[in-house]
């Protein structure tokens, strides 16, 4: 998967927030904010192809968590990003 072109992570009033830049982005009814872990993952894979295992390995490297926990967390964030339409 890959972050869809035009979506960027910005700091909005101290919060890591996904914003759609440019024509053709979806109509947002709310801001999409990310916690520190999700923002770290976003920044790590921005402009790259990635999968759940890529995200899990990043979590393991950064936080030293076990593989099962990392895969569960990585799948949850990837599923959420797919659901809201910011990755494809």
Regions inferred by a protein language model and the residue ranges of each:
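Acidic, low-complexity/disordered tracts enriched in E/D and polar residues
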Residues: 1-40
